Amino acid sequence: MRKTITDIQQMKVRGEPIAMLTAYDATIAALFDAAGVPMLLVGDSLGDNVLGFSSTVPVTIEDMVRHTAAVARGAQSALIVADMPFLTYATLEMAVAAARRLMQEGGAQAVKLEGGQAMVPIVRRLVECGVPVMGHLGYTPQSVHLFGKARVQGRSAAAARRMIEDALALEAAGAFALVLELVPAQLAAAITERLRIPTIGIGAGPHCDGQVQVFTDILGLRDDFKPRHTRRFAELAPLIRSAVAAYVAAVGERSFPTAEHSSRMDEAELREALEGLS
């Protein structure tokens, strides 16, 4: 049975840490589902982790619908949250239209959007329409061109106070959970203590109710990128390169495929098929 937002919120009540991972396709989603990940994020991070872009900004609603649908087909138990991509929730009407596609066509159970108090009317309207919404504060990747680069947010007293107020406003608007990205650990703890809804941290210290990571980071699939806030639980890049190199070599020396990898037909049938052919 698929997890619900109530299940996720009850994990906070019980003090049970919430593990969340990104997923972008059915195969990976099925693996993570079988491993017991309770919540999967179809992130617009697919832009710089799958599609080859340098940021999340170029990701479209069509991209998100397609990848969300793939994840929904692969995962049978995890709650699936889909990112609303850049400028798809600039107005109430746009937000409702984008959320409808992600849920009806993509099969998501919830959507995630970035921003603080300015997003309150959007969150409230989506919740009124029956759309569970996850908020996102701190560093917001869709605003990369404003930030210049990924950097910790909320270090000053004024910025920290503003983030606390944003978090409370999003909760009051109906958000069921809140991502805190690149936030000082003490501030993330203070926000977590003040909210009834779960906080999900990424680069926000150990005191959030849960953690989310980009799966390519924790599995070591990219040699060129190792953010401080992640831990590599595996180093798959060299294993994959070695396996693929072995495949290329086996094909090159004709040691693969062999008879055990092949099928055969009756010789009489083959002779009949070839009869009269040059």
Swiss-Prot record:
Catalytic residues of the enzyme: E181
Source species, domain of life: Bacteria
- Catalytic class of the enzyme: transferase
What are the names of the required cofactors? Answer: Mg(2+)
Give the SUPFAM superfamilies listed for this entry.
Answer: Phosphoenolpyruvate/pyruvate domain
Matching entries from CDD domains are given as: KPHMT-like
Q: Give the cofactor binding note.
A: Binds 1 Mg(2+) ion per subunit.
> Where is Mg(2+) annotated to bind?
D44, D83, E114
Among InterPro entries, the record links this protein to: Pantoate_hydroxy_MeTrfase, Pyrv/PenolPyrv_kinase-like_dom, Pyrv_kinase-like_dom_sf
The places in or outside the cell where this protein is found are: Cytoplasm
Whether Transferase counts among this entry's keywords is yes
- Any one GO BP annotation for this protein: pantothenate biosynthetic process
Q: Name one GO molecular function term.
A: magnesium ion binding
Q: In which pathway does it act?
A: Cofactor biosynthesis; (R)-pantothenate biosynthesis; (R)-pantoate from 3-methyl-2-oxobutanoate: step 1/2
Positions with a binding annotation for 3-methyl-2-oxobutanoate: D44, S45, D83, K112
The catalytic activity of this protein is classed by the Enzyme Commission as 2.1.2.11
GO cellular component terms, A-Z? cytoplasm
**Which terms are listed as keywords in the entry?**
Cytoplasm, Magnesium, Metal-binding, Pantothenate biosynthesis, Transferase
Family membership noted in the UniProt record: Belongs to the PanB family.
Q: What does this protein do?
A: Catalyzes the reversible reaction in which hydroxymethyl group from 5,10-methylenetetrahydrofolate is transferred onto alpha-ketoisovalerate to form ketopantoate.
Subunit annotation: Homodecamer; pentamer of dimers.
Q: Which PANTHER family match?
A: 3-METHYL-2-OXOBUTANOATE HYDROXYMETHYLTRANSFERASE (PTHR20881:SF0)
Q: What is the name of the protein in this document?
A: 3-methyl-2-oxobutanoate hydroxymethyltransferase
